[in-house]
C-alpha cells in the first residue's frame, strides 16, 4: 500500500510547511500561553522539546498509509501520464468510470470538462491531467492536515498533562532553569494526579521545616575550592630572616659554671684570698665549676630558599553526585521518617538545579535503591516516599553498599550522606578502615545527618562532617518558638 510520504514526494507536497504551521498553532494555543506566563522557567524547557515534536510528526506522516481508493486513483493518474493523446481518448471512458466508482472529488469536474468539449485535443489532454493533479494535491494535503490535527490533539493532551504535573512540582523541585528543564523531561512518564501529590505533601512539610531545608542547602554547598599542589609547579625565591648566635658577647644573659676567669663572680674571686679555700678554688677552676657571668649575643641575617609555588592554581572541587543512605529502622519512624524523606527531596532539588545525580539507598535488613535524578526520577521519588520505615538497622551493610558504589568510575567524585539516628551497633574494623582509606586516598567525603542527640559517638567519629537535626520534642518546640 502507498505511504503518505511517498505520495507527498510524488505530488511535491511540502509536509515541512504543514508541520511548522501545526507547531506554531500549538505553541500559540491559549492553554500554553497561560502556562508560560505562570511558569516562565518551564517555557524554555517546553521550547526545547519542539525538535522532538517535529521529528515525531515527520515519523507519523512517513509511516501513515494512504486509503486504498486514493492509492488506486494515484496509480491511474500515473498510468494516464504515459498515454499519448489518441491512447488517452481510447482510455477516457474507463478513467471516468474509475473516478466515479472511487468517489473521487475530481470525478464530477472531469465529466463536465469532457462533456463541454466535443473534441479531445492535445491541449485538453494536458488540461485534464493538470486539473487531476491539482485534485490529488488537495486530497493529499487534506490527508496530511487530518493526520496532523489528530497528532496535535494528542500532543496537546500530553503537553497539558505534563504541564499540570510540572506546574505542581515546579515550586518544590525547580530552583533554576536547569532544574526546570530536567523536571520537564521527567514529566514524560505515565503518572496520575494522586501519585505526585505525595511529592507535594512532603514539599509542603519541607517548607514548614526551614532549618531542615537550610541544612540540605549547606550540605550541597559544602565542597569548596582549595589549592591543588602540582608536580610541575614553578619554584619561587623565598626570603626570611634567621636569628643566629653572635661571636661577640653583647649582654649578660645569666649565670653559668665555667673556667672563665675574666667573668668570675666577686664571691668566687674572694675565695682565692682565703688560705683555707685557695686549693678549693683551684679544684673548681680545673673542673670548670666556677660561677661566672653568661654573656650572650645574637644577630639576624637574611636567608634565601627556593620552594614550589603551592598557591598558584585554585581548582574548584567538582560537586559530584549524592549517594544517600537512609536508615529505615523502627526508631526512624514517625517524625524522623518525615524529616528523612523531606531532606532527600531537598537534595533532589539541589541535584536537579546543579545537574548532579541523586542516588538513594534504604538500608534495614536489605538494600533498596532509587535514582531520583534519572529520566524516571519522579516515579522513583514517589516510590521512595511511599516506603514505610519499620525494619532493623544494619549500618555496616549500608557502608559496604556505599563503598561498592564508589568503586565505579561514574561515582568517583560522589559525596556519601547517611541519614540515621545512629543508635546502632559499632561498625566492624574492616568497614572503618576501608572508609578511612577512601577518605585519605580518593578524597571521598562522608556526611552524617543525625536525627537524634543520642547517636553513638564511636560510629559518628568516622564521618567528615556531622549535620545535626535533633527531632526530639524539646528541639522541635524550640525551633517552632524561634520562628
Swiss-Prot record:
Disulfide bonds: none annotated. It comes from the Bacteria. Its main location: cytoplasm. HAMAP family: ViaA. GO terms for cellular component: cytosol. Pfam families: VWA_CoxE. Homodimer. Interacts with RavA. This is Regulatory protein ViaA. Keywords: Chaperone, Cytoplasm. Belongs to the ViaA family. SUPFAM superfamilies: vWA-like (SSF53300). It is found in: Cytoplasm. CDD domains: VWA_YIEM_type. The keyword Chaperone applies. Component of the RavA-ViaA chaperone complex, which may act on the membrane to optimize the function of some of the respiratory chains. ViaA stimulates the ATPase activity of RavA.
